[in-house]
């Protein structure tokens, strides 16, 4: 998959800017706060109409602008595509693919990208939400219908949470509680199967990458966990649903007392161990960085296995934090597809990869 060129209008700090990319390695240089990450964010938008930094489209529109537009030519799945995404203050985002109007859900699955940025260290260091988000971002590109399931689950979760919060003042709300609980169990069963299947593939793909990355010193293992009554997260949807219903019944009183949803896919986690110990609790800074980057490189391999072509790989200010040996390891693994690398350095990385250099400064790209 390749981004051939992109034009930005009113996007973040860009009044108007355009860039053409090499099908191989592209090194995007510039000082801090010049818009390097904003450029990657625009490329990521092409995967499904969503940012990796914010849920609110209004934040993507530059200060003082009434709207923003991203226009790009991409090549994916053996065909050329033109994608146009328009954002307007107070309006729904509009998307066109090859001149045909699309929804964000319809855009998903037509182009894929894998991103690694400094915040991805939180996959290892933070709580379960960071790891669920990592899985959800990947699965949404692999399985386009998954995004709609996430949106439905979020809606149900918010409505049930409101019932649990307000039922003391309005007891009649409890009339609908069991129905929302059942719907959450049904959608959770679907989400859990998707996530567990992805976690299994990620475990297989990441282990050898991490072993090579760490020089054979460390062993990375991943395990998916959901609520206690689900014995097999890779079981049938029906089995998982019934197990969730059991958990829900056992925790109904606790939900009413606490005002919190205690059953469902929002309780899931991906356990990450290094040498048999929790990476979150015991990993060093270097081990954390190595593990997080291994997961992202494994994600890229999963996409390749699925689509028989590599997604665009975006490395945002990553290589500067690695020693020379680890830099070489990463650069040796990114062949075969298009890569966008941001850094504040000079063209040394480009010289090592034979890549194209783009410079971002003063709201422009050259």
Say what each PLM segment does.
Residues 36:
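Conserved lysine of the Walker
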Residues 122-123, 129-185:
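Long, charged N-terminal accessory/stalk domains
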Residues 316-318:
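Walker B catalytic acidic pair
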Residues 137, 347-360:
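Short regulatory helix/loop adjacent to the ATP-binding pocket of P-loop NTPases
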Residues 1-31, 171-312, 321-325, 329-332, ...:
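Conserved NTPase motor "head" modules and their coupling/switch loops across ABC/AAA+ ATPases, GTPases
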Residues 45-130, 136-146, 203-208, 240, ...:
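Nucleotide-state sensing region of NTPase/ATPase domains
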Residues 72, 338-345:
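Structural recognition of the conserved hydrophobic beta-strand(s) that form the central parallel beta-sheet
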